[in-house]
Regions:
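Outer membrane beta-barrel
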Residues: 23-50, 60-188, 205-206, 210, ...
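N-terminal secretory signal peptides that target proteins for export/translocation
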Residues: 1-2
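Cleavable N-terminal signal peptides
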Residues: 8, 18-19
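Extracellular loop and loop/strand-boundary signature of outer-membrane beta-barrel proteins
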Residues: 69-72, 107, 150-155, 190-199, ...
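Detector for outer-membrane/organellar transmembrane beta-barrel domains
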Residues: 218-257
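A short secondary-structure junction signal
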Residues: 145-146, 181, 189-194, 225, ...
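Solvent-exposed, glycine/polar-rich loop segments of beta-barrel outer-membrane systems
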Residues: 48-58, 237-245
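Sec-dependent N-terminal signal peptides
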Residues: 5-13
Length: 257
């Protein structure tokens, strides 16, 4: 997290130091909220974020007497999704509006202790019809199709949900917007031989690639896109002589959206 915060600060300072006869009035706007989230579940479910983000109820787990062991309820009452953030704006660089955001909550778990967790940390260069985003923010598909709702987990597991380090380019033409992005994994990771981990994507070297085109008018948004993901689940294995050797196994997927 410290490396990502440092990267954003360096990029912002670099942009500021390169200003030549351009407007340089930095504006800081803090924001945030306190959320005390109470939830009652009548059944055991697949959950995350301190068991507050409910994704899907677990299937029946019957014992020999026919009792469903997952048919039991529980409650959660936590404030860890309270949020703090700062928006930075008011600068110009390369004839573009330069802005940035740093956002965190308290949903970083270490055992039974919660810690400050990085949600977003990025800079943005915005021209009249295009923009470049560098840093950790919402996955491109999530930004345009996720409604603002009160509940923490509304729409899961069908609602796309991911914040990732990325380099993204958006171009707007009339009511259309075209997006190209290269993304890396951080918190939201892929499953593999050692469980969920970002190592499989890191070992593959190639970033996740995303391309899309969308049409938006008033309350209607229509679009299509494609997402390419390449993973390298392992880098070594044992041969017939029980000697550890290098392997180049890869898993590739193309997902139309």
């Amino acid at each position: 997290m410290k490396k990502r915060l440092l990267l954003i600060v360096v990029l912002l300072l670099k942009g500021m130091s390169s200003l030549e006869a351009e407007t340089n009035v930095m504006k800081w706007k803090p924001y945030g909220f306190v959320r005390n989230f109470f939830c009652y579940d009548s059944r055991k479910s697949l959950r995350s974020s301190g068991e507050m983000f409910n994704m899907i109820p677990l299937d029946r787990d019957l014992n020999k007497y026919g009792d469903d062991l997952n048919q039991t309820g529980d409650v959660s009452f936590l404030a860890i999704t309270s949020r703090l953030g700062i928006n930075v704006s008011g600068m110009q660089f390369m004839n573009a509006d330069l802005s940035g955001k740093i956002e965190a909550d308290f949903n970083g778990f270490s055992g039974s202790t919660t810690m400050l967790r990085l949600r977003q940390a990025f800079m943005q260069l915005k021209w009249q019809h295009s923009r470049v985003v560098i840093g950790q923010t919402w996955h491109p598909i999530t930004e345009y199709v996720t409604p603002d709702v009160f509940s923490l987990a509304s729409g899961s597991p069908f609602n796309p949900f991911s914040r990732s380090p990325q380099v993204r380019y958006d171009y707007e033409w009339k009511r259309f917007i075209c997006t190209a992005a290269a993304l890396y994994q951080f918190q939201y990771t892929s499953p593999g031989p050692e469980g969920y981990s970002a190592e499989y994507a890191k070992n593959a070297i190639v970033p996740e690639l995303f391309f899309s085109t969308a049409y938006s008018h008033q309350d209607i948004t229509l679009g299509f896109g494609v997402d390419y993901l390449e993973l390298r689940p392992r880098t070594t294995s044992l041969d017939n002589q029980n000697v550890k050797v290098k392997v180049s196994d890869r898993v590739r997927s193309i997902s139309p959206i």
